[in-house]
A protein has these predicted regions:
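Short beta-strand/loop motif that positions the catalytic acidic residue
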Residues: 366, 371-378
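Short, surface-exposed "cap/lid" segments of acyl-processing enzymes
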Residues: 86-95, 99-142
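Conserved alpha/beta-hydrolase "acid-adjacent" motif
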Residues: 210, 365, 379-387
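Accessory cap/linker subdomain of secreted extracellular hydrolases
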Residues: 238-363
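N-terminal targeting or regulatory segments adjacent to alpha/beta-hydrolase or S9 domains
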Residues: 1-75
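Alpha/beta-hydrolase active-site loop
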Residues: 165-189, 215
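C-terminal catalytic histidine-bearing segment of alpha/beta-hydrolase fold enzymes
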Residues: 347, 352-353, 380, 387-388, ...
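N-terminal cap/lid segment of alpha/beta-hydrolase-fold proteins
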Residues: 56-109
């Protein structure tokens, strides 16, 4: 275990917060440009659909105001290693991080909430400053202990082979083990959860699916002592997406995860589609996904790969290179005669069998508040796929604990326009950090949806 509270990592976290909030360091124009907008006024116009109802909602919601800017307390952040296992029983050693306030004099301290945060890897240079580190200081200063698994290091070190299966479930179980290890570290430093405290389980993007599997495990399999220790109140799953190019980007072209990304895309059709019970074959749907003209650009429909080339040209080359290099080095039978990945090859089919066995949400009826948020503007994962997830978890809308919200946001554009990932991350993070109860969450979303 290594303390990192005074290192450059934590200084970067504090500086990112200062940079965002202080006009002395970050002018409105610079702030707007950082978010992809040409001017501050353009930024205001872009965020108006969500900003106005957002602040109106906060005025009518009970918000925690006891931010702890006290000299007798300090922020501690620890990276640590912990033991876990995969769904097929392989032992792995993973890493995570926990950040919390504690008393400088060593006296016991109680936090109001535990915040489980599953997004990208927390060491990723592109996303860390804009999402994890921007919000983590706020949550910690709101007297929340933030627990984060390092998904990137896990993936690169323990890339799942075709016979391993169930990567989202892997991450869910490892999030549980990460939480136990973090609670032990907190206890060693005299930090515990208040008697009326609770846990929020937040995940977006690549973390959205593991977050839901963790929530399912908590409701259906977690031991009683674990549930009593966490008191999970709400799960927030937003902008769930694991397309091939995104995993490539966030793992620096690691070929194992490029291959995994292709199969995880398939998993959405297996795990989230009610129609799978009627005989849908994911192996047939994935090629259709890549070849159907589903995206509109300049008034015309284009395919998934065309959209990838249009919106993310810098990623396309690494995606193709990574996938083919993996096949050439490890699994040449994955390639068809024309050099494309063959969804029908035995290794891919083995993955599908594992995913069908392990990655299933149809048999889970959530016993705590679950919020699923998505933006129709997000081309990374179509809104209709996320809506199928909601229908599955809510029993066609019959479970009042499951909520689906369409969050207004701008389309993803290389120049101008806010990334829906950022908007929903902001909404979800702030909501989980400052709102006292699920009733207020529902009140908020009824206004903004």
């Amino acid at each position: 275990m290594t303390a990192v509270s005074n290192t450059e990592q934590w200084e970067l976290a504090k500086q990112s917060l200062v940079t965002i909030l202080s006009e002395k360091h970050y002018t409105p124009k610079a702030f707007a440009k950082a978010l992809g907008s040409p001017s501050f006024m353009s930024l205001l116009k872009q965020i108006q659909p969500i900003a106005v109802p957002f602040f109106k909602a906060l005025l009518g919601i009970k918000v925690r105001r006891h931010m702890l800017f006290r000299r007798d307390k300090e922020i501690q952040s620890y990276t640590f290693s912990y033991r876990s296992q995969t769904v097929d029983g392989r032992a792995v050693v993973l890493s995570g991080r926990v950040t919390f306030l504690h008393n400088k004099n060593g006296a016991p301290h109680q936090v109001k909430t535990l915040s489980l945060h599953t997004h990208q890897a927390f060491f990723h240079p592109e996303w860390t400053p804009s999402q994890n580190l921007m919000f983590m200081p706020l949550k910690v200063l709101w007297n929340s202990a933030v627990i984060e698994p390092d998904l990137q290091k896990w993936g690169i070190t323990h890339g799942i082979e075709p016979d391993g299966g169930g990567s989202a479930l892997h991450m869910a179980r490892q999030l549980a083990d990460c939480t136990v290890a973090a609670l032990q570290i907190m206890q060693q430093h005299g930090v515990t959860l208040m008697p009326d405290g609770y846990t929020t389980n937040w995940g977006s993007s690549q973390g959205a699916l593991p977050t839901l599997y963790f929530a399912k495990w908590y409701d259906t399999e977690a031991p009683q002592w674990f549930r009593e220790a966490l008191r999970l109140r709400a799960t927030f799953s937003a902008e769930g997406d694991v397309p091939l190019y995104e995993l490539t980007t966030y793992t620096y072209g690691n070929p194992n995860l490029v291959y995994e990304g292709h199969i995880l895309l398939t998993a959405y059709f297996k795990a989230f589609s009610k129609e799978q019970k009627g005989g849908y074959d994911a192996a047939e749907l994935v090629p259709q996904w890549f070849t159907e003209p589903r995206y509109e650009v300049d008034g015309r429909k284009i395919t998934f790969l065309d959209a990838l080339s249009h919106y993310y040209p810098q990623f396309t080359e690494s995606v193709i290179k990574g996938m083919k290099s993996y096949a050439e080095m490890v699994a040449p039978d994955m390639l068809t005669a024309d050099g494309e990945v063959d969804i029908r090859c035995p290794k891919v089919q083995a993955w599908l069998a594992c995913l069908k066995k392990y990655n299933n949400l149809d048999d889970w009826t959530p016993a705590h508040e679950v919020y699923i948020a998505h933006s129709p503007a997000d081309d990374m994962m179509p809104y209709e796929m996320v809506y199928k997830l909601y229908r599955t978890l809510s029993g066609e809308g019959q479970n009042p604990l499951v909520h689906m919200y369409s969050v207004p946001a701008m389309r993803i554009l290389p120049h101008g326009g806010l990334n829906p990932h950022f908007i929903i991350a902001f909404v979800g993070q702030l909501l989980m950090a400052c709102v006292e109860n699920p009733e207020d969450m529902r009140k908020f979303y009824k206004i903004v949806k």
